[in-house]
Amino acid sequence: AYIVVPGIRTAENMKSYLQKNNIEILANTENVQVVRNKKTDIWQMIFYNAGEFTHKDMTVKVDKGCALIIKKIDKDKIKLHIADPAQTQSNITVKIDAPKRSGTINCDFSNSDIYAGRTQTFDIRLK
């Protein structure tokens, strides 16, 4: 698994960052890679195909491969950043299940033109 950390310019900076022990690798398989920043509660996920990932009381399901960044805003709202690195220019459906609540969003990449696959941002309301 790997992480993207803005502002880290040297190996020494990265080593110092990792020693804070805020990062946990939750999955590193041929189907999905998931890392979570425990301090900020930001999740980064790479799905190589349709699939799902469950950790404790949260499940994320996607119907196509994609890259996700998930930030829980409050108990009923999640900020989702999604990209289609394969540039398939199609729709990707993301469903998030949490205790007694869930939310689904259809992310449309069909009119992306030269920016095919670029990151889009959505707010998901859990009901």
Predicted regions and their residues:
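Terminal accessory/anchoring regions of large secretory-pathway or extracellular enzymes
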Residues: A1-K127
